Amino acid sequence: MPPLDILLTEQPNLTYGQNIEPDIFPRRCFPDPCKHIKFNPEYADSVCGDPRLGPLTLPSRFPVSVETATYYRYGGLCADEFILRWAGDLDPKKWFNYPDFDGFALDSQGKPIKAEVTLTVGRKVDRFGSPKGKFVAPLGSSYISRSLPPSNLAPGKTGNYPDNYHVYMVLKPFSGFLGPVASWFGQPGLGSQIHLKSSVEELLTGGFLRELREDEYDEPSEYSYDPNPGKA
């Protein structure tokens, strides 16, 4: 018979009636990966029934599947450790704490690394989250480079893919602040983020951005590095 620790890492763990796949948490978190977490049946599709921990199943359709391919959800922490580290309290009403300086990485003097840039017509950017926010990223940035919490991968209000993932095209030039993302939520960050001066919602209303349909951003070449586009 295989050793117990092998069984625990190879078998889904039934917790609160959920199959917690062994690759979600480190093996040391088993056999009770959801200890100290209060299960909320309203969020039965979230890991351990806690919306802060994100969906049980990550999006499997392109392009989000590409952006999450390297994602290690909790940075080596168990569920309770992750929430205590990044929310400071296991109380379900306590949400995450976010980094200072709008989430930009800091230089050696502790100042945010950012510069004002102009987004030109035709540029595509994307976002995990509602249009009420002010952060976007270059199209196709990996999830780990964005330093976002697992909750941003949950479906939005409709519950349908890709409801909480949005792609936008610039229709009129406008400016924002571009810089590297600070490491946070157990992720390395260091991807590029753009902090907008107005919310995405306001830019949509003002005609500066247009949200693209799924069939308008499904070209694989837009999500990979190709130094010689169009050449074999």
Show where each model-derived region lies.
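Polar low-complexity intrinsically disordered regions
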Residues: 1, 231-232
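Catalytic toxin/effector domains delivered as secreted proteins or via bacterial secretion systems
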Residues: 80, 84-230
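ADP-ribose/NAD+-binding catalytic cleft of ART/PARP-like enzymes
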Residues: 1-135, 142-144
